[in-house]
Amino acid sequence: MAPVLHFYVRPSGHEGAASGRVFRRLQEKLPTLQSVETELCYNVHWAAETLPWAEEMKKLMWLFGCPLVRDDVAQEPWLVPGSNDLLLEVGPRLNFSTPASTNIVSVCQAAGLRAVDRVETTRRYRLSFTDHPTAEMEAISLAALHDRMTEQHYPDPIQSFSPQSIPAPLKGSIDILAEGRPALEKANQELGLALDSWDLDFYTKRFQELQRNPSTVEVFDLAQSNSEHSRHWFFKGQLHVDGKKLAHSLFESIMSTQASSNPNNVLKFCDNSSAIQGKKVKFLRPEDSTRPSCFQQQQGLRHVVFTAETHNFPTGVAPFSGATTGTGGRIRDVQCTGRGAHVVAGTAGYCFGNLHIPDYNLPWEDPSFQYPGNFARPLEVAIEASNGASDYGNKFGEPVLAGFARSLGLQLPDGQRREWIKPIMFSGGIGSMEAKHVGKKPPEPGMEVVKVGGPVYRIGVGGGAASSVQVQGDNTSDLDFGAVQRGDPEMEQKMNRVIRACVEAPGGNPICSLHDQGAGGNGNVLKELSDPEGAIIYTSRFQLGDPTLNALEIWGAEYQESNALLLRPSDRDFLSRASARERCPACFVGTITGDKRIVLVDDRECLVGKTGQGDAPLTPPTPVDLDLDWVLGKMPQKEFFLQRKPPVLQPLALPPELSVRQALNRVLRLPAVASKRYLTNKVDRSVGGLVAQQQCVGPLQTPLADVAVVALSHQECIGAATALGEQPVKSLLDPKAAARLAVSEALTNLVFALVTDLRDVKCSGNWMWAAKLPGEGAALADACEAMVAVMAALGVAVDGGKDSLSMAARVGTETVQAPGSLVISAYAVCPDITATVTPDLKHPGGKGHLLYVPLSPGQHRLGGTALAQCFSQLGEHPPDLDLPENLVRAFHITQGLLKECRLCSGHDVSDGGLVTCLLEMAFAGNCGIEVDVPAPGIHALPVLFAEEPGLVLEVQEADVAGVRQRYESAGLRCLELGHTGEAGPQAMARISVNKAVVVEEPVGELRALWEETSFQLDLLQAEPRCVIEEKQGLKERTGPSYYLPPTFPVASVPCKPGGPVPRVAILREEGSNGDREMADAFHLAGFEVWDVTMQDLCSGAIRLDTFRGVAFVGGFSYADVLGSAKGWAAAVTFNPQAREELGRFRRRPDTFSLGVCNGCQLLALLGWVGSDPSEEQAEPGQDSQPTQPGLLLRHNLSGRFESRWATVRVEPGPALMLRGMEGSVLPVWSAHGEGYMAFSSPELQAKIEAKGLVPLHWADDDGNPTEQYPLNPNGSPGGIAGICSQDGRHLALMPHPERAVRLWQWAWRPSPFDVLPTSPWLQLFINARNWTQEDSC
C-alpha cells in the first residue's frame, strides 16, 4: 500500500491570529481554557514504489513551507500535548477528494512531483487548560472546531485514503414482477428516492406492462429525473382550489405573461437560461483559442442572458458547501445557454431564521425557539452560506453585484411558528451570448457525447430526490449527507475556458448542444442531451476521482463542475487541444445512436476471458437500458387538491408611547433593513472589468445600490441591468399582495438604470414555498395569479425561473414552514450604462431637493412590515401596489429624466418605509437632510414606516418645478419633502411629519445604528480589531479626496502609431481570472495583445523573444491552496522550459512586466521585486532551486478576502509605468485575500523604501499613506500597495488599475472627476507603450 506522508507546518506571522479567534470562541464554553495553538498537517499520498528522494523532498518542503521562514515544515508534529492539554486533529471526510487536494495535486504535478495523487489538509489544535481536560470538554471542543457534515475527527494520523479497493456491488433488480408495489416501496425507503404514492403506482404499472424488473440504477435514475426538483409536477399539474378546477396550470399562467410584453425574448422557458435581444458591440477575442494568439477586435450581435435558481436544502445542511455549489450550478446554467454563453456577473440572496448573535440583543428574536440538529443554525447560514457563495465567485472570477438578506422567526396568532429553518440560498446570473449561438442543434447519430470538467466523485448522490422531500428532516441524516455537494471553482473556471474556446473558435463553434450537470448527475444530463435520438454510454470512459465508484454512483452522483456536450467526430481534435491547453478533463463517454434509448454499459467489468487465454469476452452489464420517450416524454399531469387556509389576523399593537426614534432603534437593526456591508466587503465586485454599477455607492461606499449594471463589452457603453424584488413576510398575510410587491420592488429598483423600454423588461420568477402542506399550495396559486395579473398591467413578463416546494423542516414534533417567497429578478438591455442614478445624496448644503413619488398614494398600511416584525407581530393589512398604472407612468417619466440627466440621486421605498429610504440616502451621501412629510391626520409611525411602493429623488433647485410637473401631469403625486444639509461627520438628520419634528440626530449616529447588525456579524467572520477600526472610521470620515497634479499627462494614443506595434503577453495560469480586462487595458493603450497560458510556456508552444511586455494577471492560481501564487511560482521555478523562457525575458533590457494581485504575489515569490536592492539579484539556477524572496504576500490582517474601492497615492520613483503620475491620489479597485506585504526584515523594507522602489501607497482621506483599515485593505506596513524593481521595468501592484481604465468602471466619481474625458489609470498603460518607443529601448 502506498504510504501517506505527513508534513507538519507551524503558523507564522499574523496568520497565527486564527488561534486567537478559536480561543475566543471556545472560552465562552470552556472557561478553564488557557491557550490555543495550531498547526497544519499536509497528508500526502505518495503513489511511487519508493519514497521521495532528496530533491523531491526539498520540493515538498518548499511547497508546504513559508518561503520567508526556514525550517517551519517537519515530518513530526510541532505540537506535543502536556498533561493538561487536549490535542485534536480535524479535517475533511475521506469519502471524497477535496477541491483543495485537487489543486495541491495540480501544483505538485506542475513542480514535477508526479507521484503525488492526493493531499488532504488537517488542522491540529493544542488546547491548554488549568486542569486535566474531561471527555465532555473534548466533545465540546470538537463540536466547535469542525463541521460535522463535511469534516471528521482524526484520533490518529491518516494512514490511508482508500476505504475499499473495489466498487461496492450493486443490489440486484427490484422484483416488481413478483412482489408488485411493495418491492418499489422498499427501494424507495432504502435509497431515499422521495417517490410519492402516485409515482409508486405509475412505475409499478409501467414495469409490469414491460414485463421486466428495473435495475437499482434505473429506479434511482427515474426518481431523480422525475423528482419534483426536475419535473416541476406542481407547477405543471392540474390544481383544484377549494373544489374549483383551475383553467390553467401555474406554468401555463406564467407563460401567458409573454402576451402583454414586447416579443424580445430569443430564449424563454426552454434552455438553461433565458435571453433577450441584445445589441451590436465591438469586442476582443483571441485569433485561435487552442494556442497562443493575438487578440483581435471583432463586432457582432450579443444578446443578454439571465438565469436564477436556489440551492436551499444543501445550504441548510452544510452552508458553505451548499452555497458554493449553488453558485457553481447557476454559473453553469449561464455557460450552457444555447451553444455556449459568457458568464458576466451574479446576484445573491439569503433568507435565514433568527440570528441569536451572542451578546447582541435583537428583542424580536424569541430565545425559547428550538433548532434541529440536522440543519445549520441561522447564524451559521448567514455567515457561512455567504462565505461559500462569495468564495466561489471570487475564485471563479464572477463578481456579485446585487442581492438581499432577510431574517424571520415568528409565532403567528394561530400558534404556528414560521421561520427559515430550511434557508433560502438564491443565486442569479447575468451573461451574454453571440446571436449565432442561440439555438442548440438536435442530436444526430454518430455525434460524440462528451463530459467536460471535473472527475466523478461520490458526491451529491440523490440530491434531486433529497431536496424534494416534503418536509426536510423526514429523510435519514446519512442520506441527507450523501446529497450534499462540494464546490471546486478552479475546475469550473477551467471548464468555462474550454467552453469559451469553443465559442470563440476561429472556424466556428464546434459545440452542437450543451447542458450542465445538476440534479440527477450523468443520468439526467446525458438523457437530456441525447433526447430524442438516444445514446450508448460507457462507464470505462469517465475519469473517476475514486476507483471504488459503482455504476449507480457514476450515473447518479451530482459531482460538480461538469458539463455535457455534443460535437461531431471531426471536431474531436479541436476540443482535445482546447481542453489540454486549459488543463481541463474532456472525456468522450459515448455516442448518439438513433435508437431512442439510453443505455449505460458498465464495461469496466468486462474481462477478456476467465483464463486470459482468448476466451470469448463476458457480456458487460447494462445497468440502464430505458426508452427515452418513456422516461422523458410527456407524462400524465399530477392532480393536486388544495384548500385555502385564511390567516388568523390580529391588529398591530405597538407600545402606546412608541416614538419614531425608538422604532428606528429596532427597524434599522433588522437584517432585511440593516447594512449589508458584511456581505459586500468579502465578495469581488469588479473582476472581469465589465461592472458599471455594483452595490456600494457614495464617498463611504455604502452598500445601497438599487440596480446592478454591466457592459456587454469592455469597448462599449451598451450593457444590461438587473434588479431584485422579494417581499415574503407579507405573504403570511396576503400572498397576492406579496407577489405584487415583489414585482413592483424589482421595477422600482430597475428604474434607476436606463433601459430600452419597460415592455422590454423580462423577469425570472423563483418560488420557494411549502406548497404541499395545508393551505400553502392554494396560497402559492393565489400569489401566482396576482403576479400574472400585475405583470399584464405593467407590460413585463416572466421568461424563466425555478421552484423549491419543500420549504419546511421538522423541529422535534413540530413542522416549521418558511414564509412563501417569490423572488423576481428583472433584467433589460441598457442603451447607455453611464446613465445610472444611485441613492447617495450628491448636493449637500441645501443644494439638493428631495421629492417623493408615492405609487399607492394615501395608503399607510403596516401589515408585514419591518416595524411589525420588530415587535414580533404581523398586523393585518400589508402594503400593496393598488394602481399598477401608477408604476407604469412613474417608470416612463423617471426613465425620461435619466436620459435628460435631471436626477442626481434616487432610491425606492421598501423595507423600513419612507424614513429608512430617506436616511439611507443620507447615509450613502454622508450628508444631512431636513425634510417634512405632509400627511394630515395620520400618525407619524404609519407615515414613516409603511412600506407602500414609491420613489424618492434628489434634484437640483433649478429642476424642482419641472420634475414635479412631469410627474403631476401624468396623474401622479410628487411631493417636495425638503432638502439636503451639511456633509461630513457634522451632518444632521431632521425629519418632521406634519411640521412636527420626530427625528433630530446626527446622521453618523443613525448610520452607526444601521451598520451595527452588520458589524456584529463581521465580528464573527473577520479579525475583530479590524472590524472595530472600520466601525470607528465611519463615524469620523468625510470621504476620500482625489487629486491630479497639473503636470499629469493627457492620456492619448496615436491612432496609427509609427513603427511596429509592441507586443505584450497576457500571461495566465490555472485559476487566473483577470486576463480579459488586462487585455482590454493594454489594447486601449495601443499594444498588440496576446493570450498566453503557462501551459503554452511549459510545453514550448511559444517563446517570448518577440514580446516587449508580460502582464502577470490577477486571480487565484491553483486556488492559492499553498499560499498566494505559490503554485504559479512552482510552475515557473521547476519547469525548465518556463524557467528559461521567463529568465531570458527578464534579462533583456528592452522588456517590462506588470504583475497585478496574483501576479504581484508571483513577482515577489520569484524575486523580480522585493529583493535586497544592494545585492545583485540571483535567478533560479540549473538545479531549479527556488530563489529566496525578500517579500511575501500574506493573508490580509482582517483574515478574509477584501473587496474595496480604495484610494492610492502615486510616489516618485523609477517605475516606468507610473511616469508623470507622481503626486496623484486616485481611487482604484482592490480585491484580494492575501495582500499583506511581509518583508524578510524591517531593514530590507527600509532599504526598498529609501531607494524609491515603493511607487504606490494606500492613502487615507487626506491622501497620505495609511495603515488604517479598511483604507489600507490588507494592513501592509507603511501602507505599501505596490513595489518595483531597481530599474523600474518590473512593477507589482496589489490593486487593479486594469479594472479602472474606463470611467464607467469607477465606483464613485466626485466633482471634478465626473467630467474627466478619460480615466487617469489609462496613463499607466500608455506609459508602457511610450517606453517601448523610446530610442534607448
Curated annotation (Swiss-Prot):
Binding site for ATP: 322-333, 402-404, 705, 910
Cellular component, GO, one term: cytoplasm
Protein's GO biological process: 'de novo' AMP biosynthetic process; 'de novo' IMP biosynthetic process; 'de novo' XMP biosynthetic process; anterior head development; glutamine metabolic process; GMP biosynthetic process; response to xenobiotic stimulus
Active site, UniProt feature: 1157 (nucleophile), 1296, 1298
Residues engaged in binding Mg(2+): 706, 745, 749, 908
Its EC number(s): 6.3.5.3
Domain Glutamine amidotransferase type-1: 1063-1301
HAMAP family with a match to the protein in the record: PurL_1
Record's protein name: Phosphoribosylformylglycinamidine synthase
The organism of origin for this protein: Mus musculus
